[in-house]
């Protein structure tokens, strides 16, 4: 723990932080940083940021800062904290009188305030269970606040926060998803070799071809398990061979050992895996444990490009182009997803009646999905160095897809249609039109079946059933069906409930408040 005493408009403030954030201080300026900050295409240190702050001011810095980072800046009467657009190190703060506690870990905030009781934020828990990622700085723990991706927050001399910007208020640079992926990869490049986690699906294929086009050398890792379809591995291997890319397959299988959870220190339920995987070192390839590799993956593509767009897009289609166009898009969607036309129509009519003018439930759901994706994935090694990231979760791509109407994400035959078409036009490979991977639902059902007792016990012991007024009979019925018979529409709720229960357990949260 370190303490900096500063003044905001003659009011004395203490900044208390854990040493996981590297700090640089001059007489009038403090910069604390974790991750990799980039300005004008070049990495910058805390000292370099401080120098620009003193020469040009805080506003100039935050307008031109890119990368994957969280940051605190103090300069004379300005105190700001912020986070990059790209999913990166978390940043939390807690206020106590004229003290502000800052860390990238919720557990550190709790450790620095042993006399405070941190209880479950019931409202945020309900939003989490419903899948609604609302734009707020509140966390799941009362009294602890989070900085969301792309946000910069300024504090006045009473430590009242004011939001200066968020990820959806930033202007995108171009409309090309592929150009943005290239820019994002180049921004994060260092002297390490690149390893692509390549499944052979659309999202990893996008990164595969952008790496090839931009002249980056890389190897491809393909994970498989005893339950995998061998055709997926052979397809990925042959595809890499066709383009002269080294291919390494690694055998990973499910590990149901619940003790592994107690090695976690999660900041949110989304960081808690449904299951752990173990690597078989005697498989066809060695596990990717090389510290000199920067791993790229296609995580987030499903959410951002609209893998499962909200069926309430019909409201937007009707408002934009009329009744016949809405009919056409609903027919396309029902054919693509195998849903009943009548059900989609009824859900749109019901939502339309209960929706205010100008409100787009489909767009709200899509933006919520993108925020969920950008919050879920980011990894550093034990030194804090970035070792795994996804090039999709960045402002140009997020901004572009936030600006598209949901009904434009697909046509009758292909989901994620705009990105498939752009990639095919640019690279000429038919991989972008293929469904190369099997559905993950079989694997999820196997995991839930194997964890049935643990799932039930964790949820019951968390206290969530009582505190949130959950009907335990209905819950038991839903749990039974999803773990023994088939997956249902309640699957996302079940997964969120389990992760939230685990989060309460691992963070020792007083759910009773």
Swiss-Prot record:
InterPro entries: Asn_synthase (IPR001962), Rossmann-like_a/b/a_fold (IPR014729). GO terms for molecular function: asparagine synthase (glutamine-hydrolyzing) activity. Gene3D superfamilies: HUPs. Keywords: Antibiotic biosynthesis, Cytoplasm, Plasmid. Residues 176-436 form the Asparagine synthetase domain. GO terms for cellular component: cytoplasm. It is found in: Cytoplasm. Its main location: cytoplasm. One of its GO terms (biological process) is asparagine biosynthetic process. Along with McjB, necessary and sufficient to process the inactive microcin J25 (McjA) precursor into the active peptide. This is Microcin J25-processing protein McjC. It comes from the Bacteria.
């Amino acid at each position: 723990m370190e303490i900096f005493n500063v003044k905001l408009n003659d009011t004395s403030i203490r900044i208390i932080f854990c040493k996981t954030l590297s700090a640089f201080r001059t007489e009038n300026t403090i910069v604390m940083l974790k991750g990799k900050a980039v300005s004008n295409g070049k990495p910058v240190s805390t000292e370099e940021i401080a120098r620009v702050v003193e020469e040009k001011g805080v506003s100039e810095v935050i307008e031109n800062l890119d990368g994957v980072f969280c940051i605190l800046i103090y300069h004379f009467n300005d105190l700001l904290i912020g986070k990059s657009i790209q999913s990166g190190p978390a940043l939390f703060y807690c206020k106590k009188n004229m003290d502000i506690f800052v860390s990238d870990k919720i557990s550190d905030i709790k450790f620095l305030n042993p006399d405070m009781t941190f209880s479950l934020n019931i409202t945020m828990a309900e939003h989490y269970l419903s899948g609604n990622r609302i734009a707020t700085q509140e966390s799941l723990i009362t009294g602890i606040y989070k900085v969301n991706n792309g946000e910069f927050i300024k504090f006045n001399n009473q430590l009242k926060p004011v939001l200066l910007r968020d990820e959806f208020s930033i202007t995108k640079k171009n409309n090309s998803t592929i150009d943005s992926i290239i820019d994002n990869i180049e921004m994060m490049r260092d002297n390490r070799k690149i390893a692509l986690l390549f499944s052979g699906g659309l999202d990893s294929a996008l990164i595969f071809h952008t790496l090839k086009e931009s002249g980056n050398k890389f190897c491809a890792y393909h994970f498989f398990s005893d339950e995998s379809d061998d055709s997926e591995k052979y397809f990925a291997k042959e595809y890499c061979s066709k383009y002269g890319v080294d291919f390494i397959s690694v055998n990973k299988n499910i590990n149901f050992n619940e003790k592994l959870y107690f090695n976690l220190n999660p900041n949110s339920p989304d960081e808690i895996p449904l299951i752990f995987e173990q690597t078989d070192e005697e498989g066809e390839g060695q596990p990717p444990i090389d510290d000199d590799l920067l791993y790229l993956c296609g995580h987030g593509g499903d959410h951002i490009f609209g893998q499962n767009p909200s069926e309430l897009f019909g409201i937007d289609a009707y408002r934009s182009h009329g009744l016949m166009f809405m009919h056409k898009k609903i027919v396309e969607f029902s054919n693509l997803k195998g849903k009943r036309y009548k059900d989609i129509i009824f859900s749109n009519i019901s939502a339309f009646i209960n929706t205010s003018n100008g409100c787009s439930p489909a767009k709200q759901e899509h933006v919520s999905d993108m925020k969920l994706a950008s919050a879920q994935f980011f990894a550093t090694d034990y030194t804090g160095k970035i070792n795994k990231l996804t090039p999709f979760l960045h402002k140009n791509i997020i901004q572009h897809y936030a600006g598209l109407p949901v009904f434009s994400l697909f046509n009758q035959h292909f989901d994620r249609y705009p990105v498939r078409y752009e990639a095919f036009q640019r690279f000429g490979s038919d991989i972008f039109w293929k469904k190369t991977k099997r559905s993950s639902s079989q694997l999820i059902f196997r995991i839930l079946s194997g964890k049935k007792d643990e799932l039930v016990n964790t949820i019951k012991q968390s206290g969530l059933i009582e505190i949130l007024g959950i009907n335990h009979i209905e819950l038991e019925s839903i749990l039974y069906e999803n773990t023994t018979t088939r997956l249902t529409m309640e699957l996302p709720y079940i997964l969120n409930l389990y992760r939230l229960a685990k989060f309460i357990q691992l963070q020792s949260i007083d759910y009773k408040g």
